[in-house]
Amino acid sequence: MNNYLRKLVEGQHLTEEEMYKAGLLLLNENILESEIAAFLVLLKAKGETAEEIYGLVRALREKALPFSNHIQGAMDNCGTGGDGAQTFNISTTSAFVLAGAGVKVAKHGNRAVSSKTGSADLLEELGVNISSTPNEIDYLLKHVGIAFLFAPAMHPALKRIMKIRKELNVPTIFNLIGPLTNPVNLETQFVGIYKRDMLLPVAQVLQKLGRKQALVVNGSGFLDEASLQGENHVVILKDNEIVETSIEPEKYGFSIVKNEEIRGGNSKENAKITLGVLSGEKSVYRDTVLFNAGLALFANGKAKTIEEGITLAAHSIDSGKALAKLNLLIAASNEKLERVN
C-alpha cells in the first residue's frame, strides 16, 4: 500500500491495474484503518480518473456476493449521494415509478452516509425487508419487478470501510462508485452524481461495464439528481457512443423549483413524502420525481424521448401502479422465501 500512497502524495494517477490491486488491499483485514483513511483522502484531493474508478469497481465486484447470470434486462437508478443538499429520497421514490412503468429495477443502496435518510432507512421505514439474499433478490426481480440490494450485505468486505467513511464524513471515491458496484449484471442505468467534472469518467466506466444505455446527470446546484432549479448537465451513453449535453426542466413543462424546496428530513418525514408522491398528490416532490423517472425511462429505452418518459412516469403514478409495486415489495420481501434459499 505504501507505493500507492506515495504516488498519490506526489499527485500521480494510478493505472487501472494499480487501482484494482490497491482496491483488493483496501478490502484486506490486515491493512490499517489509518492507511485506508489516508488513501481515500489523498485520492479525493488528487481527483479520481476513469481508470482508477474502474479499477476499484473491478475489485469490489470481484469480492461481492455472487449473483446468477440469468437476471436479464435489469436497471438501477442509484445516485452517488454526497451533494450535501439533504433532499428527500428522489431516486428511491422514482424506482417504484420505474417499476410501475414495467422496468425491472435492481435498486442498490445504503443507509445514510452524508444525508439524514438513506434509501435503506427509507425502505425500512416503509416496511420493506432490506435484508434479501441474492436468491431472494432474483425471485423479487422476476415476480415483483423491483428488489433492494443493501450494499453492506452485498459487499461484506466493505464493513470496515463503511465505518471509516462515516468517521471521515466527507464524500470519497466510494460515493462515486456506489452506483457502479451493483452486483447484478445491469443492462441500463441512470446515475446522478454530485461532481460535475466526473460526468464523463463515470459514463466511461458504465461503458466499460457493458451497459447498453445509460444517462449520467449532475443537477443544477450540483445535485446528485436531475433538478428543477435550472440547467442539468448530462452525459448519455447509447449505441456505445457517449454524448455530452444539458437539459432545462422548463422545456418539459416544469416550473422552477429551488433545491431547498425539496429538502427531506428523517426517515418518517421522507416516508410521508414518498407515500404522498406515489399516492398521486400534486407537489414539487411529485414534479421532481416525474423529471427524474422520465429521464430514467429514457435512459432505459422504455421511452424513446424524455417527453414520453415523463408521460409514462405520470401514468405509473396516476394509475396506482407505482404504489402497487411498493406494496408488493413490502409483502414479498417479508415472506419466508424458503423455496429460493
Swiss-Prot record:
It catalyses: N-(5-phospho-beta-D-ribosyl)anthranilate + diphosphate = 5-phospho-alpha-D-ribose 1-diphosphate + anthranilate. Mg(2+) 1 binds at residues 91, 225. One of its GO terms (cellular component) is cytosol. Mg(2+) 2 binds at residues 224-225. Anthranilate 2 binds at residue 165. Binds 2 magnesium ions per monomer. 5-phospho-alpha-D-ribose 1-diphosphate binds at residues 79, 82-83, 87, 89-92, 107-115, 119. The keyword Amino-acid biosynthesis applies. Homodimer. Belongs to the anthranilate phosphoribosyltransferase family. This is Anthranilate phosphoribosyltransferase.
